Amino acid sequence: MDVEGGGGGGGGAPPRGRNSWGWQKGTLLLAYQSFGVVYGDLCISPVYVYKNTFSGKLRLHEEDEEILGVLSLVFWSLTLIPLLKYIILVLGADDNGEGGTFALYSLLCRNSKMGLLNNMRANHGSLSAYNKEEPCKESRNSMLIKAFFEKHYSLRVVLLLFVLMGTSMVIGDGVLTPTMSVLAAVSGLRIKFPELHENYTVLLACVILIGLFALQHYGTRRVGFLFAPILISWLTCIGGIGIYNIIKWNPSVIRALSPYYIYNFFRKAGKDGWSSLGGIVLCLTGAEAMFADLGHFSKLSLRLGFTIVVYPCLVLAYMGEAAYLSKHREDLQSSFYKALPDRVFWPVLFIATLATAVGSQAIISATFSIISQCRALGCFPRIKVVHTSSHVHGQIYIPEVNWVLMSLCLAVTIGFRDTEMIGNAYGLAVILVMCATTCLMFLVITTVWNRWVVWAAAFTVVFGSVELLYLSACLAKVPHGGWLPLLLSLTTLLVMSTWHYGTAMKQQHEVQNKVCLDHFLGLSSGIGLVRVPGVGFVYSSTTNGVPPMFAHFVTNFPAFHRVLIFVSLQTLAVPKVSPEERFLVGRIGSPANRLFRCIVRYGYKEGRWDHFNFENQLLMKVVEFLRHQDGSGGGGGDRMSAAASGEDEAMSVIPATSSSGGSNQHAFDAGTTTSSCEIDATAGGGGRRKVRFDNDGGGGGEEEEEAAEVKELMEEKEAGVSYMIGHTCVFAHESSSAVKKFAVNVVYGFLRRNSRRPAVVLGIPHTSLIEVGMAYRV
């Protein structure tokens, strides 16, 4: 199990041709695993949808108009939102195989200047991940929308807050989904044991929740294999029982597939019918998780699983329950379990209890994925991310988030105890996330896909009108439990926005106060700088100039290493960066300075998995850069100028010489002559790998100088390696407003003190660490 990183993986499909059996087998395997992770929330909904729908003033009458209207609403809602919107359309808006609210936002950041997170920089414009889409002519509407957002900074701020709000709602779902599903399942015990006290069902629900969250550290792959048979059994049960109830009680409920009964329902039920939408919306729970969990699987595997198995079984289950209710109007509050034949009651109750754990798994996995994306893009405090699969990179586990979710789930279960109030909260959280996705899709269709604005407007009107209708009914239930997701999301939004603001202010301060190279060298000569043996890695967020914390260190302690490498780790608005494009290496100033800069680029779905090998990788890239610089004569197609620096600094993309993902130890060996250099790597599999740089007997002066510089680099590495990072405290300026002081000094300061230290995140050994303390006034 790797911390802060994983293996490779993209959609999880084997790297073969699409017509091969290997690719088909991989897709079917992912489709099978998806049952245990993605669809559980959707599939457990029949347990409580009708109960919550008829919990208000809506009642059934002899003509069956109400039950047929509710069934018609459920059927068309399932068809429009999960099937048409998400499975067919929204899954197509993936960000190189990743889904979720932040994936849509990263598409906008990469294709325009709408975003505030990691807009494309000059040094990253040639990345293959930025240029995967086929170039197409940009429409006039697309240019107008982009220009409108670029002109108004406030709109970009609102867009980011809107994305963070949608993300916060998904995280809030991670609290409500397990609570709602488990409580609804165990409530079936009271059908057979009416005298059973509520405290016992709550206690049983708490035990199940604790067990569910305790399993998370095993990873999505293991949990998926464990849970998939459970959900497939559950779908088989509810689909088969649905057919049984339709045939036995009322085959004519098939009439409800006509949308006429929706019109007839609202005409007769009026305001009570509108209010019941707060319960009907629960049939859509889990639709957003299908998109958020896309990184764990692939588009085709999700589409196969939903259209062939999940959708038909759900429709049959809802129709069968409606058929039973049409003949048993007195069983409104327990229709699901009352509709079960006596012979299968206990097996179905047992499977339902297990299926609730599966239903909760979908949103828990989505919560992990989204928080990991937020963390990588600087919108969430530094936390530990564990990659649980060496094959699919998106399968992760976050211990801190897991235990916080468990604690909140237990608190809501014990505090609310009733699925009706939790359902009111749940419905509001679900529909707000869907509205956020619809709005972002409008921008994606027009500016990323470059389609006519008419198509984007049609998408927004068709799905947005349905979602706004549901939203209006859910907002009316805010006093009756709907306040809970608002409280959870606002708290999460405060954490995310404050962390992003504080981090952005700190980085802006570092950029504004960086020291130019000429001034730094002049300062160094004026204070009698001493160069000590060894290699120094200076970590900072600046990509040009000298970071202020290093200038501060040299001013107070005028000495640094003979070889100095400024390292900047950047997370870009792409899910993954290929190993061949990860390192961007350049020289600062003249060769005599022995100053280098290395920009290490990651995608927002990637992490650091090479802590113990990172130092050697960097040095190897510098060696390759020196060789490349000499061999290319200072030019080449893969060289990029850091024009913004204003210095003599040219940077080159240094491709990966081989797969180094399994390396965990390097030993540098300077040759006995100045004409060769070997870098040995002991591979994790037991073999040895050598990267050798040789002069081919040319004997030229440039080759000798390059070999001498490489040898000196090796010797300095043997003398010792040190790491320097800034330990900065950010404070609001004394003239700042009270709100800014509270956000920066109190909230951001609290989050910074209680998040993982940068040295831990970077995997820096504490025995070689130098932390430079500075206070920033922003």
UniProtKB/Swiss-Prot annotation:
Disulfide topology = none
Query: Which sequence ranges are listed under topological domain Extracellular?
Result: 50-72, 178-199, 244-276, 325-343, 417-424, 473-477
Q: Which Gene Ontology cellular component annotation is one that this UniProt entry carries?
A: membrane
Q: Which residues lie on this side of the membrane: Cytoplasmic?
A: 1-28, 94-156, 221-222, 298-303, 365-395, 446-451, 499-778
Q: Which is an annotated Pfam family here?
A: K_trans_C
User: Where are the glycosylation sites?
Assistant: 199
- Family matches, as InterPro entries: K+_transporter, K_trans_C, K_trans_N
**One of the record's GO molecular function terms:** potassium ion transmembrane transporter activity
Q: Where is the region Disordered?
A: 655-704
Residues in a coiled coil are none
User: GO biological process: what's one of them?
Assistant: potassium ion transport
Locate the compositionally biased regions of type Polar residues: 655-677
Membrane topology category? Multi-pass membrane protein
What residues form the membrane-spanning segments?
29-49, 73-93, 157-177, 200-220, 223-243, 277-297, 304-324, 344-364, 396-416, 425-445, 452-472, 478-498
**Which compartments does it reside in?**
Membrane
Arranged from A to Z, the UniProt key words for this protein are: Glycoprotein, Ion transport, Membrane, Potassium, Potassium transport, Transmembrane, Transmembrane helix, Transport
User: Which family, according to the similarity comment?
Assistant: Belongs to the HAK/KUP transporter (TC 2.A.72.3) family.
The function of this protein is: High-affinity potassium transporter.
This protein is called Probable potassium transporter 13
What are the top taxonomic ranks of the organism?
A: Eukaryota, Viridiplantae, Streptophyta, Embryophyta, Tracheophyta
This protein's encoding gene: HAK13
